Amino acid sequence: MFSFFKKKLKFFYKRINEVLFSLIYKRPKLRLKEKDFSEKIFDIRIDKNSYKLFEFTDGRIFTDGNDTTAYISKNNNISEASLQYKKFDFINSKIQKSSRNEVLSKGTPKFKKKVNGNLLSLLSGGASRDNFTHWFTDIIPRIKIYQQKFDIKNIDKFYIPSMKYKFQQESLSYFGINSGNVISSEKYKHVEAKKIYATTHPCFHKPTMVKEWSIRYLNKIYKSKSNLNKYQKIFINRDQVKLIDKSNLEKYSEYRVLLNENEIKDYLTSIGFINIKPEEYSFPDQLKMFSSAKYVVGLYGAAMMMLAFCKKNTKVLEFKPVGGGMEFRNISKLAKLKHRQIILKPLVKSKILQNGILFCPISRIKNELKLLGLKNP
């Protein structure tokens, strides 16, 4: 009963909040056929891929930090640069038309932060706020799209999904971007600037459609030339089997875990692999490790993004749930790596397609490593 009233109270509070803020900030509208001279759109071409760069004079941005980001012109029109995602399962979303953007019905119920200068928005949906892979496929390549037209030195502030993780801070530092010239959408959800720049999505909202130019750009900015013998054979150890109760697997069906992870780790260690948890290292150190690797073995997941920084012809073995995507195999293809997969059906059905409790026989690993050219696996 208490929970019911709490939900009702929260609903009424949000509605009252929306009404009050609509008196402060006029609710945005869809632009009809007339031209909006406060918004410029530049066509950008990278390789054979077409993108758009948007420039707003005295525009504003509103985001809920997750599924909705609205770019609003000085004339209060919502731009096609806006993002409006709708979940189609427990974790995955699809982009919708601008007419489905929530600001059209709910307005912009947050006070504005004003920026006296040029602002480049790198917002890209909720996943890019926390996920290592999405940060490098959805966020960083937007800088390249902007650079096709303008010098990044012209930007005074960068509007980003988050700055709470070390890898975010470290990766931005390569551009000379630091805490002094970023605005986090986790803190400020409504901003206004003299000039706002935004781009279309680098891989068109599809993780499996990361482009070759994007991988080239990441390597130009970040790739290390280290050759550390210690890290020639890497096993990405998620170390998560300890989180589950093996006597009650159904309870953990939404996890992504190799049930025999310890057995796999022991086997790989016995043939010269070193076990690493990438998140325990700085981003520059991760770059050194993966650029030194000749073999990489790991479970489908964000840490596999580091394949983008491996040398040409590095051999990769990926454990992939049957419902997982092909984004890391695609990255390997673009980076010219040799990539094989062991596709595993979850022992217990998961509501999240790319997850599940998995088991991989050592014999399958031996066979795949042999096919990748490892002697005496």
What spans do the regions from the language model cover?
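The feature primarily captures lumenal catalytic ectodomains
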Residues: F2-P377
